[in-house]
């Protein structure tokens, strides 16, 4: 029998953002009605919807509000009212903001000054050791799929006392990749068991593919082509490792990859392969078990804020029969004459 392996990618465009409300922070001021605490509100992006109608896990408003990390904020104060944007951390230095009861809170509270403005940068989820260089932070993609984070970023410029609440519109900074898997084998005599799925930079898995780390500019707008720079290192990912009997119905997995945007198209220098290990069990009169590995090259540019699905179909080439019958051969001496009987 010959093995067959098919792969398809469904690209999904990011949707518009959905809002989440919050009340103004309760002021812990010095009883001066002239001082107003700087409070925060956030709008959270949601995952894309596939063109075929399937849906990935959604980063909802509740998810961010219930998270222990919340989001981190950098804020830079300028004493004049000029509209010049100056990013930094002289007012907020990686301040953690979390949701409690009905509001986004932080401690210690800081207050608006009568004059000047503040330029804000934000990211989520918050990480204690995140350092700001100008308007940029470094980000490392976790090597274990289950530990990867859906990085968000936002900015809000030229904010003054009259604004009261600083509202962030967060965008997805990474590309999200999911997969479905099924078999085209129909019948009761053969079982296909999935053992492993790997994404690598070569068909043999020896070359690494995905960026390990990069630098994101929090001051950039959504879809900016120069959002990411300073890529370092490469790594592969083991997407699945276990046993899963396949059927003709596609099964999706919740272990999404969150990766730095990267170009694996034909014109790019980077390569990406999906490698699948599986077991074939024959339950006919002559029972047999064998393992197999197949691979396929993925030529796709994975873009920021977009979700993708790799559709895998694992199967066998069925044994088929055909029949033909040769024509009767008429020999030259095929005629047998019998003398007549008198």
Short names for language-model regions:
Residues 2-342:
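Sec-type signal peptide cleavage vicinity
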